[in-house]
Amino acid sequence: MEEFKRYFELDRYHQHDFLYPLIFQEYIYALAHDHGLNRSILLENAGYDNKSSLLIVKRLITRMYEQNHFLISVNDSNQNQFLGHNKNLSYQMISEGFSVIVEIPFSLRLISSLEGKEIVKSHNLRSIHSIFPFLEEKFLHLNYVLDILIPYPIHLEILVQTLRHWVKDASSLHLLRFFLHEYRNWNSLITPKKTSFFFSKRNERLFLFLYNSHVCEYESIFVFLRNQSSHLRSTSSGALLERIYFYGKIEHHVEVFAKDFQAMLWLFKDPFIHYVRYQGKSILASKGTSLLMNKWKYYLVNCWQCHFYVWSQPRSIYINQLSNHSLHFLGYLSSVRLNPSMVRSQMLENSYLIDNAIKKFDTIVPIIPLIGSLAKAKFCNVLGHPISKPVWADLSDSDIIDRFGRICRNLSHYHSGSSKKKSLYRIKYILRLSCARTLARKHKSTVRAFLKRVGSELLEEFFTEEEPVLSLTFPRASSTSRGLWLYRRRIWYLDIICINDLANPE
């Protein structure tokens, strides 16, 4: 971090929370494009010209504020041809650099907060992997779950107002406000899709940062309503800092929430509240009664609308009883079912049959959403009948097989934690036959004739064993059959967040 401070000149800018001057530094845009802190390129390059970089960025910002974005002089176009491509290029270039800059003060304050309070970083930076042991260990003892679609702001200005608590630089906030306004005009930055956020792919990093900082505002209330809750980390931010400046905001919210919600805290004294957020959805699980969950439901709706100015309705929160309903979360249909068993007990001359029901946590592959994703990607129709992939017909045979095989392995990899894999076998069949149809289309033949000519070994890629990777397994006892037990039980792989989009359908 000392190298970052020296490199970004943060000691000088951070004293007054000035971020705007950093946007004129060329190395900011190198970081935005993942060039990293390469000293030979950024610090020791003889061709580095800070003045030319300053002029380029100033011209881009000037054109952003102009009414007509297509009025570009001939001289400027000759010197910097990339400025004349389209009006969106300047927005994207500046916003990519701005997304790097706006994260700097939060990372510094997060580190200083952790050092001052001696909080272990691993407790703060939890990831998706902590969700799986939570599901297996905690769900069996819970009764109800609130399935919540995270609300969205009713106006983009709310996102700017959220950052005003942390960023004091008026110029940076004004530039951010301009970004949001322009993005909304030509690409609909945030649109209500299933009452959740839909981010533009043009600069997902900036939008996810704004989204997580906004959600963090009203998520902080759970710290005070349930101080010992199982607070698990959101991972939708990708490369962003997780839970930026979260602990640093606790002291501020303690004073606010203690005054506004003191009369309501007694309603929620539940020692078994668990909260998880992931990809625009969240769940609030409890061992309490249906009445308590209804209180939580209407409390959250009123809290969001009255105190955080986000649009939410009661129908966006569903109360599910785990014993009767399945929960669609993290690409699985999760439920808790009773597994009946009968125990024979004998005392002296009398014997008894005792019915015993054991709770079991089930994770099922959701076949209908997966088929919908495959149909959207043109691997099959809406009924699940495999079709060829014409856009891949120009590739080589090995490339076609490799693409289909990669998707198939990713799906198997992700759903390895499923307790029932019959649905997954159907997905593999669809992909295998779609691959065969694509190859037959390329060679202008039928599937039967093509497979007869080349042999079925050509598609053995779909049935190759996966490479051993680090995984989460929870053996109950050591035994001689422990190795066999691991293969029969569900396995949560630690790299499932880096998979194809088909493995996690919306």
Curated annotation (Swiss-Prot):
The UniProt record lists the keyword Chloroplast: yes
Molecular function in Gene Ontology: RNA binding
Subcellular location: Plastid, Chloroplast
GO biological process: mRNA processing; RNA splicing; tRNA processing
Stretches assigned to coiled coil: none
Any one GO CC term of the record: chloroplast
InterPro entries in the cross-refs: Domain_X, Maturase_MatK, Maturase_MatK_N
Keyword line: Chloroplast, mRNA processing, Plastid, RNA-binding, tRNA processing
Record-stated family: Belongs to the intron maturase 2 family. MatK subfamily.
Entry function: Usually encoded in the trnK tRNA gene intron. Probably assists in splicing its own and other chloroplast group II introns.
Protein name: Maturase K
Native source organism of the sequence: Hydrangea macrophylla (Bigleaf hydrangea)
